[in-house]
Amino acid sequence: MSEHHTTAIFSLKGISFGYGQKDSMRPVLHDVDFSLHPGQRIGLYGPNGSGKTTLFRCITGLARPQSGQVLFHGLPLNSENDFYALRCKVGFVLQHAEDQLFFPTVLEDVAFGPLNLGLAADEARERAIETLRDLGLAGFENRLTHRLSGGEKKLVSLAAVMAMQPEALLLDEPTNGLDNDARQRIIDILSSLDTARITISHDWDFLAQTSTQYLTIAHNHLHCCAPSFAHAHMHAHPLGNEPHEH
């Protein structure tokens, strides 16, 4: 990892995690050290089952490692109350938006986080409306959540997290299953945000457009990757003007 002169938002120190009982445990993460600093935009990729989502769950206290420590602004987190403080400031956008949206209308879903932070109902409503407007979702307030498209649900789940004004974002496959238009909207929104973030994706082109540093998980360890750049190749072949696939 590169040197930083700012205090880390959160850090992992020697995190090891596995599934199962001690005598038959399947290791997923081993001795992971990592820190996220303000302004960092990190893309995280790796094969299915490599531990990417588990890493997010360890950061947020939804999974407790067998060893190691999570720190928030330099302070170790031990209790559920400690992790609650982190979750108020580190927004976790789940892979499946339906797991994050619970209320009949979009406005209720987006206002829920600010209400949980202690804002008065009117303040939470205003913040939700402002967040929806900032993300290009003005007019969605009274839409029924269950009738939204997959892409719209992803955007609303992001709005629900952004309404809490987080210091950092954890995004788990934010473009999974989206069409090109919805995917581009996510790219445009993320490109406009200064919020520190880690984004899990199998879509390398998406990561190249929205991240400036890259990590992968292999053999239970977190590894830095060399920067890559989005680019296109020209090509030609006979009958290239006919409909075809690559």
Please give the residue ranges for each predicted region:
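The feature captures the beta-strand-to-loop junction immediately N-terminal to the Walker
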Residues: 45-47
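Catalytic Walker B motif of ABC-type/P-loop ATPase nucleotide-binding domains
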Residues: 169-172
